[in-house]
């Protein structure tokens, strides 16, 4: 019985991290699904979101407004607003002027934007780690004790609930709303949507904004879960989320969700079996294994290019 608790604990830990990977991965997959390009500055948008949350919580604490609901609301609201503005700006500056040229040019532009944002944060906030309060300490224990049961922290429960609500809301938006249908139309045939009178530039900008907002939600949740942030967290989080998007099928929103969860679980069990230093090896090994047998990802669809 203790063995079952141990594996269930790893599953819970993996799903916690994986759900946040999924939120970030959706930003990659939505942009790729419409313009066929990867936003390599997306990880830095996530990093900026965590710093905005830190600043919001710190300012409220300095003013004596230390109510947990107020701090959480301020952290989410400020982070989403600021990162959405960054997402829109990245599309306007790094992608839109270069979209009609060689596909490598926007890629290089995005990498340059990523380096610029990371160094801008280093200069403004310094490179030292900063602590974000958890705000929701404590946990539930399912079983006889914490040593012989499954421990789920309040923060993990918050991560599950918020992630589920955000993904459910996004699914409804994409499937039911007029803008969501326009996003799907652009993903199917960008040129045809322009002929039908849909402003594809606005839809593309909207996907960058949505992706940035989802990254902000993940940034606040993971920041409070781990309690520490630094200017370098965006790089690894971005690579992991991109891996999740490719694993599930880049361009597929359900694929990004599934890929994030699978990647998180693979990391958790990989760290448990081989040691924490090998969790990245297991995660990327899983990606290679899936791509060997299904190059389009688990839920990806093969694309036929007309010549």
UniProtKB/Swiss-Prot annotation:
InterPro entries: ABC_transp_permease, BCAA_transport_permease
Domain of life: Bacteria
GO molecular function annotation: L-isoleucine transmembrane transporter activity; L-leucine transmembrane transporter activity; L-phenylalanine transmembrane transporter activity; L-valine transmembrane transporter activity
Localisation per UniProt entry: Cell inner membrane
Intrachain disulfide bonds: none
Keyword list, A-Z: Amino-acid transport, Cell inner membrane, Cell membrane, Membrane, Transmembrane, Transmembrane helix, Transport
GO biological-process terms attached to the record: D-alanine transmembrane transport; L-alanine transport; L-isoleucine import across plasma membrane; L-leucine import across plasma membrane; L-valine transmembrane transport; phenylalanine transport
CC terms in the record's Gene Ontology section: plasma membrane
Residues spanning the membrane: 21-41, 45-65, 70-90, 104-124, 132-152, 154-174, 203-223, 224-244, 245-265, 280-300
Primary location group: membrane
One Pfam family, short name: BPD_transp_2
Membrane topology: Multi-pass membrane protein
CDD domains xref list: TM_PBP1_LivH_like
NCBIfam families cross-referenced by the UniProt entry: PRK10740.1
PANTHER family: BRANCHED-CHAIN AMINO ACID TRANSPORT SYSTEM PERMEASE PROTEIN LIVH (PTHR11795), HIGH-AFFINITY BRANCHED-CHAIN AMINO ACID TRANSPORT SYSTEM PERMEASE PROTEIN LIVH (PTHR11795:SF371)
Entry function: Component of the high affinity leucine, isoleucine, valine, transport system (LIV-I), which is operative without Na(+) and is specific for alanine and threonine, in addition to branched-chain amino acids.
Family note: Belongs to the binding-protein-dependent transport system permease family. LivHM subfamily.
Protein's UniProt name: High-affinity branched-chain amino acid transport system permease protein BraD
Gene name of the encoded protein: braD
């Amino acid at each position: 019985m203790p063995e079952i608790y141990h594996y269930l604990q790893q599953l819970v830990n993996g799903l916690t991290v994986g759900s946040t990977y999924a939120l970030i991965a959706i930003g990659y997959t939505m942009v790729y699904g419409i313009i066929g390009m990867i936003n390599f500055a997306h990880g830095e948008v996530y990093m900026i979101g965590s710093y905005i949350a830190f600043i919001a919580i710190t300012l409220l604490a300095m003013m004596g407004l230390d109510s947990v609901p107020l701090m959480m609301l301020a952290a989410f609201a400020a982070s989403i607003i600021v990162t959405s503005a960054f997402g829109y700006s990245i599309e306007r500056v790094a992608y839109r002027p270069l979209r009609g040229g060689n596909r490598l040019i926007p890629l290089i532009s995005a990498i340059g934007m990523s380096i610029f944002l990371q160094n801008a944060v280093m200069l403004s906030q310094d490179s030292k780690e900063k602590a974000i309060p958890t705000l929701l300490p404590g946990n539930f224990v399912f079983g006889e004790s914490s040593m012989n049961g499954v421990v789920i922290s309040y923060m993990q429960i918050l991560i599950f609930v918020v992630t589920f609500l955000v993904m459910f809301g996004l699914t409804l938006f994409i499937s039911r709303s007029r803008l969501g249908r326009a996003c799907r139309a652009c993903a199917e045939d960008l040129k045809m949507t322009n002929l039908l009178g849909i402003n594809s530039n606005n839809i593309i900008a909207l996907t960058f904004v949505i992706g940035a907002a989802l990254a902000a939600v993940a940034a606040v949740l993971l920041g409070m879960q781990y309690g520490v942030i630094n200017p370098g967290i965006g790089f690894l989080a971005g690579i992991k989320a991109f891996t999740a998007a490719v694993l599930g099928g880049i361009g597929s929103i359900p694929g990004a969700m599934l890929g994030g969860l699978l990647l998180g679980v693979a990391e958790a069990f990989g760290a448990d079996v081989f040691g924490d230093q090998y969790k990245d090896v297991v995660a990327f090994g899983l990606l290679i294994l899936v791509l060997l047998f299904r190059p389009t990802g688990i839920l990806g669809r093969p694309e036929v290019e007309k010549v």
